[in-house]
Regions:
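C-terminal, low-complexity/hydrophilic appendages and adjacent surface loops
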Residues: 37-38, 44-76
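Active-site-proximal N-terminal segment of extracellular/periplasmic enzymes that hydrolyze or transfer
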Residues: 108-113, 117-160
Length: 466
């Protein structure tokens, strides 16, 4: 990592500047880049600077604090009780590890089986559950070490790969979830970020329309489900379509069926009936107002607020965590996941830790409160699995870390909208035109038609940014 006090460089050449980065950093960027879909210019802010604003920090980049995530395996009789281990690991290792647990055949991919965590017990667990705490990388867990006692217990009683990383950059939700599901990195599976260059040349949003057509390869859920003749129950409850990359493709692929998809979004749980199914009782699932009222009373003052913030109009508080946990447990119970002889798969994402990191910052007490709420939800899920399913395995990870407050690091935000304006100003672009089609968390999608008109090259723009 470059020292924070080195603010000037001897060269503006993008090749020279890129080669000055470590091999580890360059490898992460290479894994996360697709020449057809990614930004045309990739930016790597010098630590502790970051993309975003003072108010809304960004978490996309190759640096260690954004890359290191928990990767904890737990399952009575299925996962070895060895605590923290130093073995290298990545989220792409989840793909072959789930297949190994379930005794299924999947296509060989980039990840490796986390065999040191598995006991090799006979048979297969009745349920394998993958839980993602969105944005809760090791930096966040280290910041609030007392907020997650249930996860800490899983670390002690299972196997925790404390050096695990997401392995690619940008460290962003759609890309990492697809890496979890497919066992390969974005340069292979094709999901490079929230925004990407579509085949028609326009900048589009990943998983638009709640389909997985953007993903070039199948997931472990697809393959394991078909390996068992579509007999397993395969389900996911998450927050947004960005999380679908780790799930199945449903009936969108040959041989697939209508697996169960439930996305909470903004308070109404919905799915995509074209390729998936969703239990009807989830559509108007009750309890959000009840959870909001309970949280409202917790500070002794009934004013509709938590820590001074509206509860129901936002999604950055424990009420939403508890509501998701209630709905998820209802789905597990009523659909009978793990309650017959056919092994099942269930996946979930708790988004609130990430939302709080963006809205308030990972160093603020709101983050501690939401992280603890997610840990309590984890405890509730484990209680149910222990009582009813008994033979199960849980894998918990995160999709990226978060950016600490610039007040603590001395970092300076790099606003991508401002970069777009700066480029146009520097190259004297006529009013109403732009050299950029769009910007993303890590770079610029260039407008090649305008560049040709003004006789400006990629290299010139990159040198200006350097």
């Amino acid at each position: 990592m470059l020292a924070a006090d080195k603010r000037t460089f001897s060269s503006e050449d993008p090749v020279a500047r890129g080669c000055a980065l470590s091999k580890e950093i360059l490898l992460r960027i290479w894994r996360g880049h697709d020449p057809k879909r990614s930004e045309d210019i990739t930016m790597v802010p010098q630590y502790p600077n970051y993309s975003g604003t003072f108010v809304v920090p960004n978490h996309s980049g190759p640096w260690k604090y954004l890359q290191q995530v928990p990767l904890v395996l737990y399952g009575p009789g299925r996962v070895a009780e060895q605590g923290q281990v130093q073995d290298p690991a990545s989220v792409v290792d989840i793909y072959p590890t789930v297949a190994q647990l379930m005794g299924a055949s999947v296509a060989p991919r980039g990840g490796r089986v986390l065999s040191s965590a598995l006991t090799g017990a006979a048979g297969v667990p009745k349920l394998v559950m993958v839980i993602v705490w969105d944005g809760a990388g090791r930096d966040m867990l280290d910041r609030w070490p007392d907020a997650w006692p249930n996860l800490a217990r899983l670390e002690r009683q299972g196997t925790s790969y404390v050096n695990a990383t997401i392995g690619s950059s940008p460290s962003i939700t759609p890309a990492t979830h697809s890496s979890i599901g497919t066992g390969v990195y974005p340069h292979v599976h094709g999901v490079v970020g929230i925004k990407y260059r579509a085949s028609n040349g326009k900048v589009a949003n990943a998983f638009s329309g709640r389909t997985t057509a953007i993903e070039r390869v199948t997931t472990f859920s697809d393959q394991i489900d078909q390996d068992y003749g579509n007999a397993p129950k395969v389900g996911m409850m998450a927050w947004r379509s960005w999380h679908m990359g780790m799930f199945s493709h449903g009936s969108e692929i040959p041989g697939g069926d209508h697996d169960q998809l439930a996305l909470i979004g903004h308070g109404k749980i919905t799915g995509n009936p074209t390729y998936y199914s969703m239990p009807s009782y989830l559509e108007h699932f009750p309890g959000l107002k009840k959870e909001g009222a309970k949280l409202d009373r917790a500070d002794g003052k009934v004013d509709g607020k938590w820590m001074g913030h509206d509860i129901l109009s936002t999604h950055d508080n424990p009420a939403w965590v508890n509501y998701e946990a209630d709905a998820e447990l209802a789905m597990l119970k009523r659909e009978g996941y793990g309650l017959d002889d056919v092994p099942d798969i269930f996946m979930t994402n708790f988004k609130m830790t990430d939302i709080v990191g963006h809205v308030f910052g990972m160093d603020q007490p709101e983050e501690q409160g939401v992280l603890h709420a997610q840990d309590v939800a984890l405890g509730r899920i484990l209680d149910y699995l222990n009582k009813k399913v008994k033979d199960y395995a849980v894998i918990l990870t995160a999709d990226h870390g978060h950016t600490p407050s610039p007040k603590l690091t001395g970092g300076w935000p790099i606003a991508n909208g401002e970069i777009k304006r700066d480029i146009d100003t520097h190259f004297h672009v006529p009013s109403g035109e732009s050299l950029s089609d769009d910007t993303s968390a890590v770079g610029v999608f260039l407008n090649y038609a305008e560049m040709k008109k003004l006789n400006i090259s990629e290299d010139e723009i990159a040198r200006f940014l350097n």
